């Protein structure tokens, strides 16, 4: 499927997505909706307050092959690819 369809599956159906050609085992992208989290860093605590909740906008996250999660932005190649698929967990 194309990226637009994959992105809609991630955003509206809460389905993890990946490209068929990705080499990393267990890698996938998922949508993280906007939310508020307790301030974690010194900067956030100074700006928003020690016990504040910081509002974050929605973003895409990548579960990488090393098991860590990172914010993710698609490359042009990712956006134009037609090899996206829904991942079964």
Would you name each region that the model predicts?
Residues 3-45, 52, 65:
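Catalytic phosphate/metal-binding cores of nucleic-acid and nucleotide-processing enzymes, i.e., regions
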Residues 1-3, 29, 70, 79:
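Contiguous, function-dense segments enriched for cysteine-driven chemistry
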Residues 50-56:
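Glycine-rich, flexible loop segments associated with nucleotide phosphate handling
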Residues 56-89:
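Short, compact, well-ordered microdomains
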């Amino acid at each position: 499927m194309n990226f637009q369809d994959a992105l809609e599956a991630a955003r509206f159906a809460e389905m993890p997505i990946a490209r068929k050609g990705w080499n990393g085992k267990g890698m996938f992208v998922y949508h993280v909706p906007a939310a508020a989290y307790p301030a974690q860093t010194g900067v956030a605590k100074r700006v928003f307050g020690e016990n504040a909740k910081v509002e974050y906008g929605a973003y895409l996250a990548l579960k990488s092959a090393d098991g860590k999660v990172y914010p993710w932005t698609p490359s042009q190649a990712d956006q134009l690819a037609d090899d996206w698929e829904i991942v079964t967990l």
